[in-house]
């Protein structure tokens, strides 16, 4: 694993067992949207993505970009406006509808025949498709392969016991020459149960190391006042670029 030089010294906690059995249900995630408990949403977009956008896109046009657990991420509109094709998956129908409404985008919806009760929402422009379903049901649908994956708030939200299955699905969606941008969080997992969950370097290497080159682009202190209620006194975001070995 190749680490970028940084002034931030991040303590790694080898004992991550404290969170390994933590489980949030799909209904609990839906309730967070209904109750407006979406502190993870960034109205101005993700600053590290903006900073490293050229590294991520590498000058390519008309890419297929996948957003796992997309919520109403404003970056989906950014990529679509640049001519890329965006596909996302999100369990909250409310989150998806809010995305289209807040971005002033007209859209259509239709059932996903392979997944009972699921729907796909498509922008009228045709270059944004958001699947409202359980991410782990997604392999039942042929959504194609992707040139880029922007994983922010996804791996850190997946129940720790599901990470291997999640990673297998993500990698199954990649095209040759893919670039996968991954944002994770470091904090003391003995003080906060998650989500977002603590994902150490060793876990990333374990999940992606056999198939991907792993490069840490940046580490940033993202501690805010709201984090005090979590019982922690620091939180660091790490941005990784994963590429094909």
UniProtKB/Swiss-Prot annotation:
S-adenosyl-L-methionine binds at residues 29-40, 69, 90, 152. It is found in: Cytoplasm. Its EC number is 2.1.1.67. Pfam families: TPMT (PF05724). GO terms for biological process: methylation; xenobiotic metabolic process. GO terms for molecular function: S-adenosyl-L-methionine binding; thiopurine S-methyltransferase activity. GO terms for cellular component: cytoplasm. Keywords: Acetylation, Cytoplasm, Methyltransferase, S-adenosyl-L-methionine, Transferase. Substrate binds at residue 40. It is an enzyme of class 2 (transferase). It catalyses: S-adenosyl-L-methionine + a thiopurine = S-adenosyl-L-homocysteine + a thiopurine S-methylether. Its main location: cytoplasm. The keyword Cell inner membrane does not apply. The modification N6-acetyllysine is found at residue 58. InterPro entries: SAM-dependent_MTases_sf (IPR029063), Thiopurine_S-MeTrfase (IPR025835), TPMT (IPR008854). Monomer. PANTHER family: THIOPURINE S-METHYLTRANSFERASE (PTHR10259:SF11). Belongs to the class I-like SAM-binding methyltransferase superfamily. TPMT family. This is Thiopurine S-methyltransferase. It comes from Panthera leo. The gene is TPMT.
């Amino acid at each position: 694993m190749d680490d970028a030089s940084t002034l931030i010294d991040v303590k790694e906690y080898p004992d991550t067992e404290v969170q390994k059995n933590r489980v949030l249900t799909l209904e609990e995630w839906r309730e967070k949207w209904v109750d407006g408990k979406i502190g993870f949403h960034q109205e101005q977009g993700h600053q590290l993505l903006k900073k490293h956008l050229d590294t991520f896109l590498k000058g390519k046009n008309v890419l297929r970009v996948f957003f796992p657990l997309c919520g109403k991420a404003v970056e989906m509109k950014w990529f679509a406006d640049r001519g890329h094709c965006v596909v996302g998956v999100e369990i909250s129908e409310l989150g998806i509808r809010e995305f289209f409404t807040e971005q002033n985008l007209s859209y259509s919806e239709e059932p996903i025949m392979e997944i009972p009760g699921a729907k796909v929402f498509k922008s009228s422009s045709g270059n944004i498709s958001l699947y409202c379903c359980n991410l782990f049901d997604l392999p039942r649908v042929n959504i194609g392969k992707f040139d880029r994956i922007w994983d922010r708030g996804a791996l850190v939200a997946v129940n720790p016991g599901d990470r291997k299955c999640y990673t297998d699905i993500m990698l199954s969606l990649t095209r040759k020459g893919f670039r996968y941008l991954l944002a994770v969080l470091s904090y003391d997992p003995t003080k906060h149960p998650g989500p977002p969950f603590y994902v150490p370097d060793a876990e990333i290497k374990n999940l992606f190391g056999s198939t991907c080159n792993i490069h840490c682009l940046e580490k940033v202190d993202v501690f805010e006042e709201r984090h005090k209620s979590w019982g922690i006194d620091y939180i660091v975001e790490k941005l990784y670029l994963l590429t094909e070995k």
